[in-house]
Curated annotation (Swiss-Prot):
GO terms for cellular component: nucleolus; preribosome, large subunit precursor. Belongs to the LOC1 family. Residues 121-178 form a coiled coil. One of its GO terms (biological process) is mRNA transport. This is 60S ribosomal subunit assembly/export protein LOC1. It comes from Scheffersomyces stipitis (strain ATCC 58785 / CBS 6054 / NBRC 10063 / NRRL Y-11545). Component of the 66S pre-ribosomal particle. Residues 7-16, 174-183 have a biased composition (Basic residues). The keyword Coiled coil applies. Required for efficient assembly and nuclear export of the 60S ribosomal subunit.
């Protein structure tokens, strides 16, 4: 025969069976009112959702003719903020293409050297040693002349700068002399003017 259950055991057994977790919204009236008055936090989408029929049509068009590319925007149209760059003092950033050197139209020396050096690749095919040495000698001469011209340009620039500084110094010197002469003239005029006689009183 099974042992007899106590009343407390029976009560706990029945309680465990019927226990349920009920939400406060259903049990508490004030909580229910709070939920009812709560505004919609998520904004309603401004873009209208397409119907299934329209979407199907669009998909069919894409399959037939391909998808259209969206509008391409330039960088200045996108309003991208420009970042602050660190400026290194005394270093000027080079502009333009890297390693690009422009040749003047009247610079026949450089142009002829370039033409000769470019034609090298095609002349090598059938030329004698004598022709090759002559061509290389011409190239060397042209390069030498170019270097001499560059040196001359540097010297001219230096001389020009020197003369400019000398002229500036001489102009400053002449200005100083003029100012000194003018000041001396004013002083002389002031001394030449007769001073007014002042009455002197003597006490015996």
């Amino acid at each position: 025969m099974a042992p007899r259950q106590s009343k407390t055991a029976k009560r706990s057994k029945t309680q465990n069976k019927t226990r349920a977790n009920e939400s406060e919204v259903f049990s508490d009236a004030s909580a229910r009112n709070l939920m009812a008055n709560q505004p919609k936090l998520t904004e309603k989408s401004k873009v209208k959702k397409l119907s299934k029929r329209v979407v199907k049509k669009q998909q069919a068009k894409i399959r037939l003719y391909g998808a259209k590319n969206g509008k391409e925007y330039r960088e200045d149209q996108l309003d991208i903020p420009t970042l602050n760059k660190a400026i290194i003092p005394g270093v000027r950033a080079k502009k333009g293409k890297k390693g690009k050197k422009f040749v003047d139209d009247n610079d026949t020396l450089t142009l002829s050297r370039l033409v000769k050096s470019i034609n090298d690749k095609y002349d090598v095919v059938n030329e004698s040693k004598l022709e090759k040495s002559r061509r290389l000698e011409e190239l060397r001469e042209l390069k030498k002349k170019e270097i001499e011209r560059k040196e001359q340009q540097k010297m001219d620039k230096l001389e020009g700068k020197k003369s400019e500084l000398k002229n500036r110094a001489s102009v400053a010197r002449s200005n100083r002399r003029k100012n000194a002469k003018a000041a001396k003239k004013i002083e002389d005029e002031e001394t030449d003017q007769p001073r007014k006689k002042t009455k002197s009183v003597s006490f015996a």
